[in-house]
Amino acid sequence: MEKKMIPAERQKTLLNLISKQSVISINNLVNILGVSHMTVRRDIQKLEEDGKVISVSGGVQLLERLSSEPTHDDKSLLATTEKTAISKKAVELIQEHSTIYLDAGTTTLEIAKQIANRNDLLVITNDFVIAHYLMVNSQCNIMHTGGLINKSNRSSVGEFAAQFLHQISVDIAFISTSSWNLKGLTTPDEQKIPVKKAIIQFSQKNILVTDSSKYGKVATFLLYPLSSLDTIICDKGLPENAQARIAEMNVELFLV
C-alpha cells in the first residue's frame, strides 16, 4: 500500500534523497518512499521537465551545473566524431540560395566546413573562427554581427550584436549550446542572452545542433524552452526518455 503523500511533498522528498547521492536507483526510491514504480517514474518525469533532475539507466541524478562556458579551444577537442555527423545532417536541411545563421560554437564550425564549396549561401555569424574559416576557404557570402568580443569563446555577444540581428531575416538558424535539458537551453554567461534571444525571433526555422554530452546540464540563465525550437539534431547518445518527451513537444528530432 502506498504511503499517503501529496505529489509536491513526495517530489521534494525525492529531490532531497537524490541530492545526497550522485545517482539513486528507482528501486531504492520505491522502497524508501513506499510507492509504486509508476508513481516514482511519474515524479521523476515531472522533476525532469522542471529542469531539476535527469533520468539515467535504472535511476536518476541531479543535473550537472555549468558555472562557466568552456573555451573554444576546450570545446574543439570534445565529441569530434559526433559533431561531424551532426553537421552533415544539418547541411542536408539547407536549401539553395538560403540565408543562414551559424551561432558561435565548434559544432557550427563543422557546419561551416561542410558548406565551404557552396556559392549560393549568405552566412551570418557572431563567431570569428567561423567567419575567418569561410573568408579563407569558402565561396559563401559572409556577414559578421560585430559587437562586444568574448575572447575565450571567440565570438561577439551583447546588445550591439543583437541589434544587428534585429535588422535581418534568416531562413535557418543553427543554434549551439553548452547546457540543455527538458526545460530548455541555458547559459552561465549573461552577455550571451541578447544574441541568443534575438536570432530565434528573426529566423524562419530554428535548429539546435548539439551532442548528447551537453544534455542534462543546467546553467544560471534560461534562454528559451525546447518548444521554441523547430528541430534538434543530436547523436544517438541522447537518453530515450528525452527523445520521447521531445517528440511530445512536436519538435523534430534527428539522431545521427
From Swiss-Prot:
It comes from the Bacteria. GO terms for biological process: regulation of DNA-templated transcription. The keyword Transmembrane helix does not apply. Residues 24-43 bind DNA. Transmembrane segments: none annotated. Keywords: DNA-binding, Transcription, Transcription regulation. The keyword DNA-binding applies. One of its GO terms (molecular function) is cis-regulatory region sequence-specific DNA binding. InterPro entries: Carb_Metab_HTH_regulators (IPR050313), DeoR-like_C (IPR014036), DeoR_HTH (IPR001034), NagB/RpiA_transferase-like (IPR037171), Tscrpt_reg_HTH_DeoR_CS (IPR018356), WH-like_DNA-bd_sf (IPR036388), WH_DNA-bd_sf (IPR036390). SUPFAM superfamilies: NagB/RpiA/CoA transferase-like, Winged helix' DNA-binding domain. Residues 7-62 form the HTH deoR-type domain. This is Uncharacterized HTH-type transcriptional regulator HI_1009. It comes from Haemophilus influenzae (strain ATCC 51907 / DSM 11121 / KW20 / Rd).
